[in-house]
Swiss-Prot record:
Lineage summary: Eukaryota, Fungi, Dikarya, Ascomycota, Taphrinomycotina
Basic and acidic residues: bias regions: 66-83, 152-166
Biological process according to GO: mRNA cis splicing, via spliceosome; mRNA splicing, via spliceosome
Name of the protein in its database record: Pre-mRNA-splicing factor dre4
A matching Pfam family: WW
Length: 411
């Protein structure tokens, strides 16, 4: 029978079933069962004894925390590995790279359901695009010398790697000769401090998938193959539709217009819309058209919006406001600091705006139609409005609702 817990400590169970202990007063938890601190049961306790008990309790708690951190690291290393995400291999419909939570990766065939640690020859040329994490090659002799202290021989390391591959694929697909000549340990560019500490202390240790983990992993891959139907549907798209879908991908990813294609396309490989176009040449062509469109749109927007803030400010003010009052209040406002416009220009625009805004809506719309006719612009198509129209008071006095009613009218 286990001893009762000290006052303030309660026992709980983690989702993994491992018990841990929590002290609400100290706001601390530990996997190590707390024990009673010996007390003097005499009626009188001296101050020195109380101080000694406190110091002992503090040291015990520090030791428990250190033990807890060690147990937590060991527990994480014992947890089964799981697939984290996968990447499609360019120019190949059958193979994907699967990355696991333990920072490992392998190659999986979606059609044959075979998996390999080493890339098959048919996809080796396409892997450079993915920029996979570096795998450090370790020779047989050096790996044997490293495993002397850890108690694990090179033969056992090879057996683990072979055992993992055997569980994840059909045995007929393995090439044993390559495994026996070279071992592979994976080294990533970005690692947390905790992971680096674990690697230093357990550099020769390899985690092994269990049968349950492999079944779960393959099930995950089977479930995710639905997303690849998009690529099959892409063959039914017309050329124009495919180009439109690819352009939408560039917009959704917020691709800048001044980035080179060589740096852009690796960011798009994970999206199925990248494959609606069947060649890199067509993708680059659509990308260049997209860049030209973005640049031209920015130039037009910059030109069109010269007085937009000024018109917005006037709409927010009462129609009875006079120029002297406006000038006194907004003289130093950034809204009136527009290159090419003097104070006299703003006064003229202000007075015209205040007069025209008091007219009936039909009169305002009629004046605007005459303005558009003089500029040979369709008043129902805002995309055609030029700078001269957008900076004219006959356009500025119209509200958004009035412009919408004009666009919806049949005349």
């Amino acid at each position: 029978m286990s001893q009762p817990l000290p006052p303030g400590w309660t026992e709980h169970k983690a989702p993994s079933g491992i018990p841990y202990y929590w002290n609400a007063e100290l706001k601390k938890s530990t996997y190590q069962r707390p024990s009673f601190i010996e007390k003097n049961h005499s009626s009188s306790v001296t101050a020195s004894q109380a101080s000694l008990a406190f110091n002992t309790s503090e040291k015990l708690f520090v030791n428990e925390n250190a033990e807890e951190r060690k147990n937590s690291r060991d527990l994480r290393k014992q947890l089964p590995d799981r697939p984290k995400f996968k990447k499609r291999i360019p120019n190949n419909d059958s193979w994907v790279v699967v990355f696991t939570k333990k920072n490992r990766y392998f190659f999986h065939n979606l059609k044959s359901h075979e998996s390999y640690w080493e890339p098959p020859l048919e996809i080796s040329k396409d892997l450079k695009i993915l920029r996979l994490p570096i795998r450090k090659q370790i020779s047989k002799d050096s790996s044997q010398s490293q495993n002397v202290d850890s108690g694990k021989t090179n033969h056992e390391e090879i057996h683990e790697s072979r055992h993992l591959q055997t569980e994840i694929e059909e045995p007929s697909g393995l090439e044993e000769s390559s495994e026996e000549s070279v071992l592979y340990s994976e080294e990533f560019y970005e690692k947390s401090d905790e992971e680096e500490d674990e690697e230093k202390s357990h550099s020769a240790e390899e985690l092994e998938f269990g049968e349950e983990d492999i079944m779960y992993q393959l099930q995950q891959l089977d479930d995710e193959t639905v997303s690849y139907d998009i690529q099959e549907q892409a063959t039914n798209l017309s050329t124009d539709d495919a180009r439109r879908v690819f352009t939408e991908l560039l917009k959704d990813k917020n691709i800048g217009a001044y980035q080179p294609w060589e740096l852009v396309y690796p960011k798009l490989l994970d999206d199925d819309r990248f494959y609606v176009l069947d060649s890199g040449e067509r993708r680059k062509e659509v990308f260049e058209e997209y860049c030209k469109s973005v640049v031209s749109t920015k130039k037009i927007t910059r030109r069109k919006n010269t007085l937009s803030d000024f018109w917005t400010l006037l709409h927010s003010l009462p129609s009875t406001l006079l120029w002297p009052q406006f000038k006194r209040k907004y003289r130093k406002s950034s809204t009136l600091q527009i290159p090419g416009y003097s104070e006299r220009d703003f006064e003229k625009l202000f007075r015209e705006f205040q007069i025209l805004r008091k007219q009936p809506m039909q009169d305002k719309l009629l004046n605007f139609k005459k303005l558009c006719k003089s500029k040979t612009v369709d008043p129902k198509n805002p995309d055609e409005f030029t700078e001269s129209i957008l900076n004219d008071t006959r356009y500025a006095v119209l509200t958004r609702e009035e412009l919408d009613s004009l666009a919806c009218s049949s005349n």
